[in-house]
A protein has these predicted regions:
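An N-terminal hydrophobic leader/cap segment in hydrolases
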Residues: 8, 12-54
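Alpha/beta-hydrolase fold nucleophile elbow
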Residues: 140-151
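Acidic catalytic loop of the alpha/beta-hydrolase fold
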Residues: 219-223, 249-250
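Catalytic histidine-centered segment of alpha/beta-hydrolase-like enzymes
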Residues: 247-257
């Protein structure tokens, strides 16, 4: 009997260790879900082809869309950072919801038509490069740029806001730390030791002085409201959040309140000088 129990425990231990090894070496596949552009979608996107841009960074092509409208303090450039499974061209079908802001939607490496492989380091490095490239090429002051990130993209926006002086930051379904999210979903694993790409936004949030608004989905089952609110509370600059109580993680932008909240914040920021 003792031998049977010991053998069972040994099998469980080996299985647990094997699972840890699998999670450690394959963690990128659990963090990033690159999405391409289907032929049918590519046909729909032809109407936006005049907005397409390609830039090269570290030998990789980064592809996206730049809607260059009149640039002024009242009409800033919004740089958008998508979620971990988001191909950002979906946002092009909501252009009418923005008034006169310029808009930049760039896909991460391996998303859409961008090449390469995504990682925390590459997302952060590319984001700074893209920011500087468009700011310099189109003579747009960094203080006339608003960063907007959704889910994982909120971590990218937070990182850029730490390293560049910007007009404001908008975070959709943000989180304080990917480690803490993983701990909530996988409490039996030592994720703090396993996670090589922690996206620890909360550690740099206090250093950011730009005003920030977060929009939170009340029924989010992926990023708990606690994770979002904790980031807001640690933000160095003026910050607040709005909760859309019936929205889920992937449906938040389907609610009119989402767009009303976004429009109100943009209107307030148009009057703000940096």
């Amino acid at each position: 009997m003792k031998t049977t129990i010991a053998n069972l425990l040994l099998i469980l231990f080996i299985f647990y260790c094997a699972t840890l090894a699998f999670l450690y070496f394959k963690q990128s596949s659990f963090i990033f879900f690159p999405t391409g552009i289907s032929k049918s979608k590519e046909f729909l996107l032809k109407q936006f082809s005049h907005f397409e841009v390609n830039i090269n960074h570290d030998g990789f092509n980064l592809h996206g869309w730049f809607i260059n409208r009149e640039s002024s303090p009242e009409h800033p450039l919004i740089i958008y950072y998508g979620g971990n499974a988001e191909e950002v061209s979906n946002n092009l079908f909501d252009l009418e919801k923005y008034e006169k802001e310029s808009l930049l939607f760039m896909n991460y490496r391996s998303y859409g038509k961008s090449t390469g492989s995504p990682s925390q380091a590459s997302l952060f490095s590319d984001a700074l490069f893209i920011f500087d490239h468009f700011s310099d090429k189109y003579n747009i002051s960094s203080t006339n740029i608003i960063l907007m990130g959704r889910s994982l993209g909120a971590a990218v926006a937070t990182y850029v806001a730490k390293h560049r002086q910007v007009k404001a930051v908008i975070l959709i379904s943000p989180f304080d730390s990917l480690v803490k999210i993983a701990q909530e979903h996988y409490p039996v694993f030592p994720v703090k030791l396993l996670l090589k790409q922690p996206f620890e936004s909360v550690q740099i949030a206090q250093e950011i002085t730009a005003p920030m608004m977060a929009i939170i989905a009340g029924q989010d089952r992926i990023i708990s409201n606690e994770r979002s609110v904790n980031l807001v509370e640690h933000w160095g600059g003026k910050s607040h959040y709005v909760t859309i109580k019936d929205a889920g993680h992937n449906t938040i932008s389907n609610y009119p309140k989402y767009w009303d909240t976004l429009r109100l914040f943009l209107s307030k920021m148009a009057k703000r000088s940096v």
